[in-house]
């Protein structure tokens, strides 16, 4: 894969990142996507540009976004006993035709590096068993399962990583 451009999104170039995130959300969760825009995407600058616990990274091929990853301040909505300055890794998605080329791993490495450079030491994420190979991928990135939750809506796997 030649000439991929990885970059941290700033306040002047986030519109296409939001559009891509909404598109991927609809692909992954069509039954809950009904046109509502999540709070973090409505307030992108607040969550990902101005907040020191926020970061949003895109990767482009021929000026088209083909993948993203982000972190934001964890809101402690699950009772998981995580450190106060934990960030939540969100929005990892690579278009299917670009997968199996190491792009997701490179996005993770860039995100982890950014977090370390900003004195972040605790990462949290959750994934779902219906996402193929997600738990295995995150384990390969150094995350450990801290809790499994079986619910009526989405079974959830909670994972964390220390930097």
Stretches found by the model and what they are:
Residues 101, 105, 109:
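Residues forming the Rossmann-fold NAD(P)(H) cofactor-binding site
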Residues 108, 115-126:
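Conserved GNAT acetyl-CoA-binding A-motif
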């Amino acid at each position: 894969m030649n000439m991929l451009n990885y970059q941290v999104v700033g306040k002047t170039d986030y519109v296409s990142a939001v559009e891509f995130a909404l598109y991927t959300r609809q692909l992954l969760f069509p039954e809950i996507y009904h046109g509502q825009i999540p709070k973090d995407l409505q307030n992108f600058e607040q969550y990902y540009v101005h907040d020191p616990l926020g970061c949003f990274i895109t990767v482009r091929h021929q000026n088209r976004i083909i993948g993203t990853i982000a972190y934001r301040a964890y809101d402690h909505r699950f009772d998981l006993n995580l450190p106060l300055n934990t960030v939540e890794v969100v929005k990892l998605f690579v278009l299917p035709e670009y997968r199996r080329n190491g792009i997701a791993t490179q996005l993770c490495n860039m995100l982890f590096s950014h977090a370390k450079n900003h004195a972040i030491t605790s990462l949290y994420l959750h994934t779902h068993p219906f996402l193929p190979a997600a738990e295995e991928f995150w384990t390969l990135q150094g995350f450990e399962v801290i809790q499994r939750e079986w619910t009526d809506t989405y079974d959830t796997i909670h994972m964390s990583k220390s930097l």
